[in-house]
């Protein structure tokens, strides 16, 4: 049986704004130069929910940038700063910087510019920050040749209707998600974070080009009791219209993370076909 492992050579150069550009080229087969064509794009975003740089790099060492994007959240970014994020980008990974900005328009706009300068692939902000904040963010990165995807956070997947009621929103989570997603789209954002249950109605409301990033993805939802309530399997989420699937523990705690990624990508290819 032929060896199907890929070797990657990392090419680095600066763009006209001085940012580092990266490209992976498969050196075993020059015809395969970019896994993430529109037909081959992997939907998986692996949440690197580690507490330190050592554990993160130890895990990422075994991953293939062709099989997934990666996400750094508040805990890891606070612990390691931008050095780890830039290291992962330089290794060829598309990085989702999940810091959920929520501040005055100028502050969020400047933060998005810094993320763009780093070469971040995706960055998010709370859509509840309002139109002026989101428009400022979109304007801040508009001049970049390869700008990060700007994603609005709608309703956290840990929240249920009772949680919304406690903060004064007497509305179903699905209605609030659609309301905030429409606001995000009209404010110039590229997509939103939403649970898979909201993906189908959002597709109907906002069209096929709007990016839907879905956390709460589990390989098997039976017996799930973690802190994300509105969950689905990869196949269910993709069928519902999700663009990207955020997976943390199902990948990071798997005995064979690469096998999990290959299986999810196999399911994704079947859904696409």
Where are these regions (language model features)?
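Hydrophobic faces of well-ordered beta-strands that scaffold small-molecule active sites
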Residues: 44-48, 70-72, 95-99, 123-125, ...
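Alpha-helix-loop-beta-strand connector modules within alpha/beta enzyme cores
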Residues: 84-96, 139-151, 202-219, 264-272
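Catalytic cores of alpha/beta
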Residues: 106-114, 225-242
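C-terminal helical cap(s) of enzyme catalytic domains, especially alpha/beta-barrels
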Residues: 134-138, 251-273
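Glycine-rich phosphate-binding active-site loops on the catalytic face of alpha/beta enzymes
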Residues: 125-130, 230, 234-260
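N-terminal amphipathic alpha-helix/helix-capping segment at the start of soluble metabolic enzymes
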Residues: 28-51, 55-58, 200, 204-205
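Conserved anion-binding
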Residues: 41, 103, 107-111, 118-190, ...
